[in-house]
Amino acid sequence: MKTKNLLLVLVVGAMALGCNSVNQTSAPLKTAADTASFYLGYLNGNGMAQMGMTDLNMNALVAGMNSALQKKEMKTDQRDMEMYLNNYFQKLSIMRAAANLEKGKKFLAENAKKAGVDTLSDGIQYKVIKAGEGPKPQETDIVKVNYKGTLLDGTEFDSSYKRGEPAEFPLNRVIPGWTKSLKEMPVGSTWEIYIPSDQAYGPRGGGPIGPNETLIFEVELLEIVSPEADKK
């Protein structure tokens, strides 16, 4: 990841998280600048944590920020700094991807032994929460669903429930794990679906979803909006 892109990610992340509640620091925030400083630090820290940057030296981080704010002359030029950071984050991403892949494999192996959990093709697992009796969608259908998605640690990264309305999408334009599992779901069903990383977002991840993350979705299939049969 290029350093300039990293900065953009942190700023955009801060804007996206800005409406969420933040637990107040124990340090007194007496002025507007105090509050803005704390919020900026919190939101950027949140963005860095989502990217797996949890082993940073906080003293060095603050020292670097102070040096920049005070416009101190540096012995290392900016280009060399960016090259160093690009290499560092590339290695960090590789390590994080390997750890996530191993964690996902271990979770799925244990999950497959649980009562009520079945396995589809390509290692996709599911558990029926509510059995529907409607038709099953085809790959070319448009479906209407309610859903929420979480990481293995319980972090929720998406939810139609929180948006207040169901989602509609062509079944052949989503991640493979969704396409393959929803094709087996009768309308009216609610399933919990466990999707291996290679059937989700793979080594690239996306947003709060890290590289090689195994994902858990609770999906309620409400209806087939545009059945393929109606197009013939």
Residue ranges and their predicted role:
Residues 2-6, 19-232:
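Cross-family detector of peptidyl-prolyl cis-trans isomerase
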Residues 13:
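Glycine-rich, flexible loop motifs
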Residues 10:
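Oxyanion-binding "anion nests"
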